[in-house]
Amino acid sequence: DEFAQHEIFDEAAGRAESDWLVKTGDAQVEFWNTLLNGMFQEVVQIKDSQTLEAYKNTVDAVIIPAVADLQYTIPLHTNIKIYEIWMKYRFKMVSLEDVHGNENGDLSIKPDQYFADWTMTAYGKTPTAFLQSDEEAVNLAAVVALRDAGANFATSFSRVPDIAAWMAEGLQPPPAEATDIQRLEND
């Protein structure tokens, strides 16, 4: 799973710099599980065909998160004693019927099968004061960015036009034609 394994590697540009590996996957999964369990009645991670089959009649929709972009700055880059992380997320929602199990147990959806698709950004920063290391500072900035993402998601989820329409229709995914029309109106 790309989301659970998310990391960014930044190779040093010169001798004075060092390589950076920022792993966010585990923290992302733990954070989003906590947030989503607080927002919804029940949350199920559908990781394989067996889980898909077990929950086929009980899941209202599937949220597919992705980290579309992650950027960071450190004092070496900016000459300011602040560590910053920017994350851009892309979320898609599909009905469970649009998730397909493959022979090898992996799951897939057709690229155009979603009924909601939206992006969201998050930002976190931390000063270097009181921190033991660069790694600790980057990790703290990532935690702040995750909190920002959670607040943004929780307060804006029901205002995403396709989500609002889905909720108004009793949590049934709208017909493909209606979703396409709504998406065109939003573009």
What are the residue ranges of the model-derived segments?
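Short, well-structured alpha-helical interface segments that form or flank functional binding sites
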Residues: A27, F31, W86-K88, L140, ...
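Short acidic, glycine/proline-rich loop/turn micro-motifs
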Residues: I8-A12, I74-T78, P127-S133
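Surface-exposed patches in mature extracellular/periplasmic domains of secreted proteins
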Residues: V43-L52, P161-M167
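A structural "domain/chain start" motif
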Residues: D1-L35, T155-D187
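Surface-exposed short loop/turn segments
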Residues: D48-Q113
